[in-house]
Amino acid sequence: MVSAFYAFLDYLKNIKTASPHTLRNYCIDLNSFKTFLEKHGELTPSPPICLLTKERQEAELPFSLLTKDTVRLYILKLMQENKAKRTIKRRLSAIKSFSQYCVKQRILPDDPTETIQGPRLPKELPSPITYEQVEILMATPDLSKYTGLRDRCLLELFYSSGLRISEIVAINHWDIDFTSHLIRIRGKGKKERLVPITPHAAQWLQHYLTHPARTSIEKDAQAIFLNRFGKRLTTRSIDRKFQKYLRQSGLSGHITPHTIRHTIATHWLENGMDLKTIQALLGHSSLETTTIYTHVSMKLKKQTHNESHPHS
């Protein structure tokens, strides 16, 4: 079964063009299930599944262990360990995807996970921040430094276009059209879309790209956002910088770069943009995903009404 795990991960990477983050999560989830199956079958533990491993050793893990009962026992074990519902659901989803792949490849005659359902998750609404909080966060980077200018530009792009971190780090020079104020974005599954940027954000971007400090360290001629060594910034480094500015700004609450994406989507909706346009701008494959912002907007309106009403 281990060789099938690797074949499945290669399929996700090369055919489905899954992101490194997605592949890392699949490795974590499948390794967890593999360890359980080895203990359940009283087998000798084998090295963890890792895409970085050049030599992939087949281990003794027969497909006869992959049954409806063993998957249910695994889910029960996770629940007994008090794993979060979201973690359990994600791990079951990884096993289901693997089983479906094996059926398509005729490795398995049928899918043993087909009727198994994970725990129901409470429907959580995104928590946008206010325009004033956005402005406070924008004003935090030190513009006397080149890195501060770069980070201000990053924050402007987050709010201007509602981009994901992975989309921002992937932007190249030829993706930007300053004349029409458009950026070509490669989203999930490498699906491309054109996203407008505000003239304000475009000015910050031009200022950053022409800064002498940037041109002097540039080693990656394609990338827009560079680290201090002139190489492309990573999603992890942007997330760390975001958290640093969040601490410096004094803003409280759980705020992430994705919060800014939720925020601008909510602001677009409140200012009259229709859901289909928001869906296209955010790169949502389903309108159902975008519809959640109507609930967020109504929640905020109710809150404002209650706070402002004299009888409240």
Curated annotation (Swiss-Prot):
Active site positions: 164, 188, 258, 261, 284, 293
Gene3D superfamilies: 1.10.150.130, Intergrase catalytic core
GO molecular function annotation: DNA binding; tyrosine-based site-specific recombinase activity
One of the protein's GO biological processes: chromosome segregation
Keyword hit for Cytoplasm: yes
SUPFAM superfamilies, sorted: DNA breaking-rejoining enzymes (SSF56349)
PROSITE patterns: CB, TYR_RECOMBINASE
Pfam families hit by this protein: Phage_int_SAM_4 (PF13495), Phage_integrase (PF00589)
Name of the protein in question: Tyrosine recombinase XerC
Protein's organism: Chlamydia abortus (strain DSM 27085 / S26/3) (Chlamydophila abortus)
Gene that encodes the chain: xerC
